[in-house]
A protein has these predicted regions:
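A short Gly-Trp-Pro
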Residues: 14-17, 22-165
């Protein structure tokens, strides 16, 4: 099988297996290829008033939480440190909902009602981006991890989660 190396895109290269008898070696790809450790993903709410960018890998590690809020909304968490999140527009369109301890700040677009990101209780110095609100074109794959949000304190015994990005 002949491969046109010049026509391959980065996602195609990621899928190449190295080391097996029927695969291509790293030297065939060439040392000039660089696969970025992270990608800038853009996204926003339904009406478009709230827009943001988030820096994360192209293959996302997402948390699926079983708490009442996440289950009802279908939220899939991409949790990032604050310095990897940038709100581009819509600050004046956001409204905040808090409950229980008040640590988590659930931010909703006051026009369309979508929660595209928020400040989670588990990561109060970062953001949880709703992966369902990311624009098409930059995500190459997703790995889902179940999180026990119903028993939050047991899931995060030290009171804070770690970042995967």
């Amino acid at each position: 099988m002949e491969i046109d190396w010049g026509s391959l895109r980065i996602p195609d290269l990621i899928q190449v297996k190295f080391g097996s008898a029927d695969s291509y070696t790293k030297s065939q790809i060439g040392s000039c290829m660089h696969i970025p450790a992270s990608t800038v993903h853009s996204g926003g709410c339904h009406c478009g008033r709230v827009r943001f960018e988030v820096e994360a890998p192209a293959h996302l590690q997402l948390d699926v939480c079983n708490c009442s809020m996440c289950q009802r909304s279908g939220y899939k968490h991409l949790i990032v440190p604050a310095d990897r999140f940038k709100l581009l527009s819509g600050q004046d369109s956001l409204t905040t909902y808090t409950f229980n301890t008040g640590t988590a700040r659930h931010l909703f677009c006051s026009f369309c009602g979508i929660k595209s990101f928020y400040v989670p209780r588990s990561h109060p110095d970062g953001f949880s981006v709703n992966a369902n609100c990311l624009d098409d074109g930059t995500v190459t794959g997703v790995t889902l991890r179940q999180v026990d949000g119903r028993h939050w304190e047991a899931h995060y015994p030290d009171g804070k989660g770690a970042y995967d990005v």
